[in-house]
């Protein structure tokens, strides 16, 4: 969008209104907006930030509705969740991540320099005029709604974001987690690392939101485990996930075997051998519920341990499969 003779006064008035709302006095910058401009340069001390005019007008159309909690900022048809990508809090080039998650009227994507989060940080004075930008240091998962009627509740937005984070964690070798918005001037120093692309893809990868796993306690446990920085503790939390699903896996297996036994009843007599097999099946199920067997049961049933054997820690090395199995 370019500034024209017809819209320049409206654009200047809107910028002035929004900046006043968040506590900025930038009349000089506003007065310098000229025809054919597509961006405005905002000077925050030693930090200059270029703001796309079209995006600014779209996302701050209802600036009075802006609200925020510990992790996200909402304004009109947009919600931005602050996220971290493991090892790359600073200098991240989010263009390496191509996903756009869509369903009717709703789109979720990664956004560098998230405008709404930046405005929240300015309003709350959570930036440093000399060293820390309120916008450029952040990355967000942005939910955009085509119309107000498609807006989710705050609770459902969190569930949707957790589903998207699960998908991103599964796809990349980076850990994507929600990150609490700053409650002070965040002058911590992070290591700057180069982000390597996991593919040579350059087009946006459109993914249906309907294809994502449904939100569940197990999905929440997975996200919580990925947020733990200590790898030993993270491993223990992943083990708890195996424990969580193991009763369901054990029940599934015993149902399958029980059905096989009952099918056999149709073609054979109910003799002592048959009844003993049912008793043994029950005993095997009881044994499968013991702590020492649970992890083996889940991994044997749900994972290809031939491919994973080099990644399995030594304490569970005894449960590895061989090709013959």
What are these regions (language model features)?
Residues 2-230:
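Charged, non-catalytic interaction/linker regions at domain boundaries
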Residues 200-325:
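Amphipathic, oligomerization/interface secondary-structure segments
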């Amino acid at each position: 969008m370019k500034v024209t003779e017809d819209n320049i006064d409206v654009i200047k008035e809107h910028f002035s209104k929004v900046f006043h709302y968040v506590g900025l006095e930038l009349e000089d910058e506003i007065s310098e907006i000229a025809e054919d401009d597509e961006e405005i340069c905002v000077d925050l001390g030693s930090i200059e930030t270029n703001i796309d005019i079209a995006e600014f007008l779209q996302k701050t159309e209802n600036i009075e509705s802006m609200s925020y909690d510990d992790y996200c900022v909402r304004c009109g048809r947009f919600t931005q969740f602050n996220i971290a990508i493991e090892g790359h809090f600073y200098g991240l080039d989010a263009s390496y991540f191509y996903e756009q998650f869509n369903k009717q009227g709703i789109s979720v994507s990664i956004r560098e320099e998230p405008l709404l989060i930046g405005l929240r940080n300015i309003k709350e004075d959570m930036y440093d005029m000399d060293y820390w930008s309120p916008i450029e240091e952040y990355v967000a998962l942005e939910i955009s709604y085509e119309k107000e009627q498609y807006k989710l509740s705050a609770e459902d937005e969190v569930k949707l974001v957790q589903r998207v984070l699960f998908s991103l964690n599964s796809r990349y070798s980076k850990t994507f987690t929600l990150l609490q918005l700053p409650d002070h001037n965040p002058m911590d120093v992070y290591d700057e690392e180069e982000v390597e692309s996991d593919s040579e893809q350059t087009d946006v990868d459109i993914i249906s939101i309907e294809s994502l796993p449904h939100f569940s306690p197990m999905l929440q446990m997975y996200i919580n485990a990925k947020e733990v920085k200590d790898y030993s503790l993270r491993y223990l939390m992943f083990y708890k996930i195996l424990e969580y699903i193991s009763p369901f896996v054990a029940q599934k297996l015993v149902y399958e075997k029980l059905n096989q036994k009952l099918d056999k009843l149709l073609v054979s007599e109910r003799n002592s051998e048959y009844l003993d097999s049912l008793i043994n099946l029950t005993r095997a199920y009881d044994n499968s519920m013991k702590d020492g067997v649970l992890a083996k049961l889940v991994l044997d049933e749900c994972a290809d341990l031939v491919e994973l054997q080099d990644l399995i820690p030594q304490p569970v090395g005894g449960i590895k499969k061989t090709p013959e199995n």
